[in-house]
Amino acid sequence: YTDETKSATTNDYGAAQRVIYGTATPKYFGSFNNTFRYRGFALDLQFYFSMGNYVRDAWGTYAYDGFNPTSNKYKRNLERWQKPGQITDVPRYEYGLQNFSSQFSTRLLYKGDFIRLRNITLSYSLPRKVLQKAGLGVTTFYVRGFNLLTKTFDDRLTFDPENGITSTSNLNIPINKTVTFGLTVEL
């Protein structure tokens, strides 16, 4: 497009105006926790959310056009424009293209809204009667998961939306999903 009205298109990269679409800084973020208890069981949940910002796929500059033809490309390149009349938002691949046509493209800009199950713990504490006979204090078995579920609200987003202050992904390693098992015994 030539400007923010999106009323005209151009093939001349220099003829397009730069437009501010949003901010990398979330408008809202926070977390909420809850614990549910029933008899000896406890379920602890912590959710974290971030809303109202955009994230940019910096690596997409290299992975979508033909700038670096020998490097790995995104699977979405299979949806690229290939013949007249085809409708797609992935441009034609030009082998050896050197103009960084994707550098400041909105194709690489995504809504960064997400909610993540940051921590979930399911535990069971043995009854006190059993423990007193064994001479033990509180004994709890648990299984804990970290970052097991992330819901994003932009269907095109293929990377972890939780990233640094610039909200730019550059092949960053996503936050690990971790599951631990444990036993806590008080003597």
Locations of the language-model features?
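Outer-membrane beta-barrel pore domains and translocons
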Residues: R37, Y48-S50, R144-L148, E186
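Strand-connecting loop/turn motifs
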Residues: Y38-F41, L136-V138, N176-T178
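C-terminal beta-signal and terminal closure region of outer-membrane beta-barrel proteins
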Residues: K73, L78-G85, F100-S102, T150-L187
